[in-house]
Design a protein with these regions (language model features):
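Canonical positions in the second alpha-helix
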Residues: 11, 44-45, 105-106, 140
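Short coil/linker segments at helix-helix boundaries
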Residues: 65-102
């Protein structure tokens, strides 16, 4: 995959407006578990095509995966200080928060996409103690149930 990055970067250099190249670059970095580069590539996808569902959706997914990876690291640590734990938790939650607007844009583009609603519902539940997020959770949970035909 690292060889592919060099090839795609060379192709992007001569064709920087090609959404498919940026999309492919983002997927390769995802496979390499380089979430920051993946996110940067997909930000370019969305810059070039703001209403592309997949671009917005995958940005949300990559922020969520990055948050999951940081959360896993955090869970493996031994904490002797509540302040250090709280600081690490804030970093993790801030990454999850970054996912929300991308999923919201994806939801706006494709309102009946169950996966998008499930991500929004789950992330908003996790962040429910943040200002205004519990209301979002209630909204997305209701929409999710409606789309899934639950209740």
């Amino acid at each position: 995959p690292a060889d592919l990055v060099a090839l795609i970067d060379a192709a992007i250099e001569s064709n920087p407006e090609n959404v498919d190249l940026w999309f492919g670059r983002g997927r390769i970095f995802y496979a390499l578990k380089d979430y920051d580069q993946s996110i940067e590539s997909f930000k370019k996808v969305v810059e070039l095509k703001p209403d592309l569902f997949e671009g917005n959706y995958y940005l949300g997914v990559f922020y969520t995966i990055k948050g999951d990876a940081l959360n896993k690291e955090m869970n493996e640590k031994q904490y002797s200080s509540q302040a250090v734990y709280d600081a690490d938790l804030k970093v993790v939650n801030d990454v999850y928060k970054e996912a929300v607007p991308w999923f919201e844009k994806a939801h706006q583009i494709k309102p009946d996409d169950v996966d998008t609603l499930e991500f929004l519902k789950s992330i908003c539940f996790r962040l429910r103690d943040e200002a205004g997020i519990m209301e979002k959770y209630n909204t997305y949970n209701a929409l999710y149930k409606q789309v899934k035909g639950i209740e």
